[in-house]
Regions:
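Membrane topogenic/interface segments and analogous intrinsically disordered interaction regions
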Residues: 7-269
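Extracellular interaction modules
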Residues: 1-6
Length: 271
């Protein structure tokens, strides 16, 4: 059974709303979104010590699942390259007095934002749906569902593959034997959040393209005509996101993004 707020929206969808009606409904939406976000933020803040040890700092340890997969692949196919056999561990240091507290706060904030994304999309859908025609409602609902799923797939790929590869490369990169690499807590968290969220946003390509097609700015012929250009752009973006420079990392990041780019044409046709 829909909530009273949702019922009010759908009861009024057959008559034209005034500017103040829209503003009042938007205010309710913002309050609900902020309420859900606040609950997640408090929960993450309380659980942050455990999350740091078992999730956020997991890529620092040699037993992280992706490193185990690399070693298994190397052992199975008799690959002796250091990429597959490297033993890896990173110890972070803190050089700012207040850094642990602010990192605690900011990490809880961003985790709560990511977790609340499905609910935010749901509220967006519920707010705009009364103004749409039935066929537009079906399209927007499908696009928001796809966008939510793809965002979390991108976040998972960033966490389990892209960031560990980047961390392992940059933390072991040696400019001079006289320079010892010591990674600060702030540097680790900044790069962690940036890469994971960038992968999530990169996976929103189908949703963005669908919205552009809805506005008549992108067409099937355009996507097919500039397919090769898109591949070059994807490789460049992958190189920026993962500054490791090795072909393997560029490949594992570029392939999913390219497949998404190809799927956009299909999504454009069937949505």
């Amino acid at each position: 059974k829909p909530s009273s707020a949702a019922s009010d929206v759908y009861k009024r969808q057959d008559k034209e709303l005034t500017f103040w009606d829209h503003l009042d409904e938007l205010r309710r939406v913002l309050f609900r979104v902020l309420g859900v976000w606040f609950v997640f933020a408090v929960g993450y803040f309380i659980a942050m010590p455990w999350l740091f040890d078992n999730v956020v700092l997991a890529p620092c340890h040699n037993d992280f699942i992706f490193y185990d997969v690399l070693r298994y692949v190397g052992k199975t196919f008799n690959l002796n390259d250091e990429f597959f056999t490297q033993q890896f561990h990173v110890k972070l240091i803190n050089i700012n007095l207040a850094a642990p507290f602010f990192v605690h706060m900011s990490t809880a904030f961003w985790m709560s934002v990511v977790t609340a994304t499905p609910y935010i999309f749901f509220e967006i859908w519920r707010f705009i749906s009364p103004a749409l025609y039935p066929n537009e409602r079906r399209g927007v609902k499908k696009a928001l569902c796809i966008g939510t799923v793809m965002f979390f797939l991108g976040v998972l790929l960033g966490y389990f593959m892209v960031y560990p590869l980047t961390l392992r490369f940059l933390s072991t990169y040696e400019l001079s034997a006289a320079i010892e690499n010591q990674i600060s807590l702030n540097s680790y968290i900044d790069n962690f959040m940036m890469l994971v969220l960038c992968m999530g946003l990169a996976f929103e390509l189908p949703l963005v393209t669908w919205l552009l097609s809805l506005l008549g700015l992108v067409h099937k012929s355009f996507l097919r005509k500039y397919r090769r250009h898109a591949l070059v752009i994807i490789v460049i973006v992958a190189a920026i996101i993962t500054p490791t420079g090795d072909p393997f990392t560029l490949t594992v990041v570029s392939i999913p993004l390219y497949l998404l780019c190809e799927s956009v044409s299909y999504t454009h046709l069937t949505l």
